[in-house]
Amino acid sequence: QVLLPGNDKSKFQQRSYEGLDVFFVQEKRDKHDIFYTVGGVIQNNKTSGVVSAPILNISKEKGEDAFVKGYPYYIKKEKITLKELDYKLRKHLIEKYGLYKTISKDGRVKISLKDGSFYNLDLRSKLKFKYMGEVIESKQIKDIEVNLK
């Protein structure tokens, strides 16, 4: 089941829909063994392949393993929820840079949009429920900065 935070409830009033993409990460499990996720609902893509490739800048400033890297981060969706982007960025950082394993669990992610607005993510804590349904037009992402500590 999908729990819809905030104004997402007003977007989805019907019992069933077609053409939706649901990014499901188990958030809760109730006493009847039903799995729940929060947010993560968008319309299906109209196109296939890479839609957006904002620059992903990653830096670790302290220690002997300090580094700065920048490269395109490929997004294959026209719209992506903050929940899915957060999950995929963390997965990328775990696989490529040992986040939560070999380097500190501390760090921040800043997702900057072309209109000047941005989202900040704290790598020490889980994305808050109220932001999980936030939808971003992937072509509007200017860049993504990751600062590992």
Spell out what each predicted region is.
Residues 119-121:
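Generic detection of short hydrophobic beta-strand segments and adjacent strand-loop junctions
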Residues 49-117:
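Mature extracytoplasmic domains of secretory-pathway proteins
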Residues 124-149:
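Proteolytic cleavage junctions
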Residues 14, 28-32, 75, 79-83, ...:
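Low-complexity, intrinsically disordered regions enriched in charged/polar residues
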Residues 1-69:
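Long, low-hydrophobicity ectodomains and other hydrophilic envelope-associated domains
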